[in-house]
Amino acid sequence: MKFTYTEHLGLDENNQPITNDYKFLRTINTEKIFKDETGDEFNAQLGEVVSRLASFEQDPTDPQKASEITSLQFIETRHDVLKFLYAQTVDGVLVQNEDTRKEYEELDLPEGILFNQFLAKLTGQK
């Protein structure tokens, strides 16, 4: 499965958008990275988020796909996935505690940027 995540960096001196595109391809290798770096439940949530984003990217004019990625359930799932960006690995399991949750919430960055950072970290692209 392929999808592109676009990070919006602002505007240049000509008021043109500055973007950075990250292209992801879920392969056996990236599946192994996801499996090694995450637990089963988290991997399932990540898979759901990636799948819906990829589906929307393939046809952004489809109102059904647009409503799927803007639904409250999807946003909550994406939020849960992003919280693990600052989780710690303890005995081979990702653990989130008060310190990591507080660090995540204090960043106050748009979730799109955080999701981009997380995927780039998992795939070694950034």
Give residue ranges: language-model regions.
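Short, intrinsically disordered N-terminal pre-domain segments
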Residues: M1-D12
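Short, surface-exposed, charged amphipathic helix/loop patches that serve as local interaction elements
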Residues: E13-K126
